[in-house]
């Protein structure tokens, strides 16, 4: 093989870009297919998860182009928000709290722009067919304008409010977050059994948050727990702190956890919050916004949460309040960005009011076609489990500003006008006075929006970037990973319902997760990260994409080297198959043959027609792995192992007889089928297919295989049972050679074939040449048997 894969990929990348192969230029008469492409963050490098899930989207984009659609496949970056801030902090060591916030924001912009350029080259190298020449970013003025405009739309619809309310906060990132950004992790901890004094007797409770004793506002037991019925309504004294709290009963208390008695603090977890709300309990906050214990924590004041936990246990033990400790592993809510256990605080925040719309969100989810369908259950479970309105304000810096000021004189909230957007109230004065008291003494909102508040608008942002929103919304397809169903899929469906009373796309295609070869999650700490560029350097982008096509939508995948090897072997096999056809052609011009006559050529066209139907049906149903599996079998077994080997013998014999009609017919048929094989592989393996397509001199060729027509199942099946029977004879000869310990390519002196003699006689010469057999004896038999003599 003399194919330089690296140079081939570079050549076609340049060719596609120079010739605007993927430019979206619709006309009123053409079919259009629109895609809501996931905008990746700019924080870090591409990884195997990217190559897996984005390849799935690209498979469909390329297929739809070949089916005659103008495909709107934009590119964008989600470059604002906490992910970018943390990336810049890590790279520079500079934090926004160091003093110069404006300098930090400029750094975020600079790093984003530099990262975007490098990342785009990586996505191109992977063979993505997006329109990279004009991409959007979520921090651009036009994106900010859309995000702020939709915020004002929420104001008009009474779907947004600012309130002093419990919110989820990450102590590490020092910002509020939403329920969307939490994940459940199983973490090790200690369950501490602590005695409370109850009017001279003892009540033992079990807690994993003893540092919150200063925030204890009640003890709870189950109403039906016979052990504790006589103490409901009495008071207990909190150890070390001395304040008294009521003992109350509620059916939600688990009688079998710990002692069946628990303390409610403000706030240890969601259960604390629920009971606090339900019974209008007092508020005692003992952790500050930075995750430090405050004055309400008494002797723990100034300590971190973990240090406070250790110290309170020591103090409780020294005073004899600890009954016992147990090592446990339990589910803890953590921030998905940094893994820190979250806390619940009372803060003034902006919220999108949507808990009353859960049924509407379920209905919207059901109006979308899910690929695979069972992923919709995850979405519905998430919606049904929502307990909080969406907190969209963040105490950070590099994000979309709220278009809001507050009147210092009357406290009124002043919203910017649509005509003034985009606006940054932190830097720009308002264009109007307070619409309640007329004061000009207005102060800006300094919080920024949650990045998902903007990312949830990507269909609007991407289409509006090209002036196409009114024409093509809702879009046809969104592709994404199942790990962000609760993030991106849900928020986009929710915003689409609230703003437009519709769904954002017709189909939602979900990809699985990527694991190492042993099924373990990849991480730096485990040392099992696979470098995507090392894979493409060694095997090529087509092999990487081949790997990505090995599992069905929604299924997880492992990174196994044999899949990349198979992908590269397929690249080489295609290249060599096409070279063989060129060798057989021997420089003769390719002549169009409308109706082949040779039975072997009719047979391969029949087999091709079958696989075209199977592959097309599979691709129409987003079953790319099924399509590729069927194509692999046809290409490797039917086309290469049987047909190409047969026509070597057929062309050789025809040349000896000067039967140029058979030669021309066979070479044309082989070239046509090779071209169609290339077309069917093209969505998955774009580079090698372009290389081969450009080398096939056949009528009707387009500028690129990726904008040519998809093969059609365009002929009636011919009777091909005779040649199928011959392929069975070939298989038996190969097996007989193997049993005789002779390689397939090694000549043998003689073969005895017991079979349908009338068929075998027609193909005696072909079988002899193809299988390298000196002489063939044929015996008529109902049973097919073959033996060889080396």
From Swiss-Prot:
Short motif ('KMSKS' region): ranges: 521-525
Keyword Nucleotide-binding among record annotations: yes
Reaction(s) catalysed (UniProt annotation): tRNA(Val) + L-valine + ATP = L-valyl-tRNA(Val) + AMP + diphosphate
Gene Ontology CC annotation, any one: cytosol
Major subcellular site: cytoplasm
Domain of life assignment: Archaea
Record keywords, A-Z: Aminoacyl-tRNA synthetase, ATP-binding, Cytoplasm, Ligase, Nucleotide-binding, Protein biosynthesis
Binding site for ATP: 524
EC numbers, comma separated: 6.1.1.9
Record motif 'HIGH' region, residues: 40-50
Residue stretches spanning the membrane: none
Enzyme class name: ligase
Known role: Catalyzes the attachment of valine to tRNA(Val). As ValRS can inadvertently accommodate and process structurally similar amino acids such as threonine, to avoid such errors, it has a 'posttransfer' editing activity that hydrolyzes mischarged Thr-tRNA(Val) in a tRNA-dependent manner.
Domain-level remarks: ValRS has two distinct active sites: one for aminoacylation and one for editing. The misactivated threonine is translocated from the active site to the editing site.
Protein name, UniProt field: Valine--tRNA ligase
Taxonomic classification: Archaea, Methanobacteriati, Thermoplasmatota, Thermoplasmata, Thermoplasmatales
Gene (name only): valS
């Amino acid at each position: 093989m003399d194919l330089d894969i690296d140079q081939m990929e570079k050549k076609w990348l340049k060719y596609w870009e120079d010739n605007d192969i993927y430019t979206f230029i619709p006309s009123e008469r053409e079919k259009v297919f629109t895609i809501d492409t996931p905008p990746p963050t700019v924080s870090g490098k591409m990884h195997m998860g990217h190559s897996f899930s984005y390849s799935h989207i690209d498979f469909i984009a390329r297929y739809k182009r070949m089916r005659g659609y103008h495909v709107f496949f934009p590119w964008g970056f989600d470059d604002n928000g906490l992910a970018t801030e943390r990336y810049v902090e890590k790279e520079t060591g500079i934090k926004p709290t160091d003093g110069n916030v404006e300098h930090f924001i400029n750094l975020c912009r600079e790093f984003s722009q530099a990262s975007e350029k490098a990342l785009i080259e990586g996505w191109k190298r992977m063979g993505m067919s997006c329109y990279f020449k004009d991409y959007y970013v979520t921090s651009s003025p036009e994106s900010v304008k859309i995000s702020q405009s939709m915020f004002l739309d929420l104001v008009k619809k009474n779907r947004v409010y600012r309130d002093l309310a419990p919110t989820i906060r990450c102590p590490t990132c020092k910002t509020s977050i939403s329920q969307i950004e939490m994940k459940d992790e199983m973490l090790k901890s200690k369950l501490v059994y602590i005695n409370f004094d109850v009017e001279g007797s003892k009540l033992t409770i079990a807690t994993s948050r003893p540092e919150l004793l200063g925030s204890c506002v009640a003890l709870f037991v189950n109403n039906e727990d016979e052990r504790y019925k006589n103490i409901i309504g009495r008071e207990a004294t909190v150890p070390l702190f001395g304040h008294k709290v009521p003992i109350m009963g509620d059916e939600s208390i688990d009688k079998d956890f710990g002692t069946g008695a628990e303390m409610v603090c403000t706030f240890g977890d969601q259960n604390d919050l629920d009971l606090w709300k339900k019974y209008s309990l007092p508020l005692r906050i003992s952790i500050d916004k930075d995750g430090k214990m405050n004055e309400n924590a008494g002797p723990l004041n100034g300590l971190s949460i973990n240090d406070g936990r250790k110290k309170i246990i020591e103090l409780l033990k020294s005073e004899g309040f600890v009954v016992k400790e147990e090592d446990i592993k339990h589910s803890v809510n953590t921030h998905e960005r940094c893994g820190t256990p979250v806390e619940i605080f009372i803060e003034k925040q902006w919220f999108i009011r949507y808990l009353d719309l859960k049924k509407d969100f379920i209905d919207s989810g059901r109006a979308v076609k899910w690929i695979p369908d069972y992923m919709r259950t995850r979405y519905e479970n998430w919606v049904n489990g929502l307990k909080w309105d969406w907190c969209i304000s963040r105490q950070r810096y590099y994000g979309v500003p709220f278009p809001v000021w507050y009147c210092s004189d009357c406290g009124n909230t002043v919203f910017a006008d649509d005509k003034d957007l985009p606006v940054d109230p932190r830097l720009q004065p308002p264009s109007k006075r307070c619409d309640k008291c007329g004061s000009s003494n207005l102060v800006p909102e300094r919080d920024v929006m949650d990045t998902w508040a903007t990312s949830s608008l990507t269909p609007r942002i991407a289409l509006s970037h090209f002036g196409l929103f009114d024409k093509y919304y809702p879009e046809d397809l969104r592709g994404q990973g199942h790990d962000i169903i609760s993030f991106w899929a849900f928020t986009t469906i929710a915003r689409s319902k609230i703003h437009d009373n519709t769904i954002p796309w017709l189909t939602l295609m979900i990809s699985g997760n990527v694991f190492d070869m042993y099924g373990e999650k990849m991480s730096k700490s485990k040392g099992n990260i696979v470098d995507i560029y090392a894979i493409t350097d060694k095997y090529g982008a087509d092999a990487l994409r081949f790997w990505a096509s090995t599992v069905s939508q929604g299924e997880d995948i492992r990174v196994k080297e044999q899949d990349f090897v198979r992908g590269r072997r397929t690249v080489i096999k295609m290249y060599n198959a096409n070279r063989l056809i060129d060798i057989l052609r021997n420089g003769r011009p390719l002549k169009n043959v409308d109706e082949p006559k040779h039975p072997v050529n009719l047979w391969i066209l029949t087999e091709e027609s079958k696989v075209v139907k199977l592959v097309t049906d599979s691709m129409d149903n987003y079953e790319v792995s099924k399509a590729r599996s069927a194509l692999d079998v046809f290409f490797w077994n039917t086309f290469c192992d049987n047909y190409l080997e047969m026509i070597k013998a057929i062309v050789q014999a025809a040349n000896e007889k000067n039967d140029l009609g058979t030669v021309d017919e066979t070479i044309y048929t082989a070239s046509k089928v090779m071209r169609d094989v290339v077309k069917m592989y093209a969505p998955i393996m774009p580079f090698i297919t372009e290389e081969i397509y450009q080398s096939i001199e056949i009528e009707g060729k387009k500028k690129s295989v990726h904008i040519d027509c998809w093969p059609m199942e365009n002929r009636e099946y011919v009777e091909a049972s005779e040649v199928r029977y011959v392929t069975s004879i070939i298989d038996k000869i190969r097996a007989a050679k193997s049993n005789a310990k002779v390689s397939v390519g090694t000549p043998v002196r003689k073969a005895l074939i017991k079979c349908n003699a009338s068929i075998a006689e027609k193909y005696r010469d072909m079988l002899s040449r193809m299988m390298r057999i000196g002489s063939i004896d044929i015996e008529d038999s109902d049973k097919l048997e073959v033996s060889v003599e080396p």
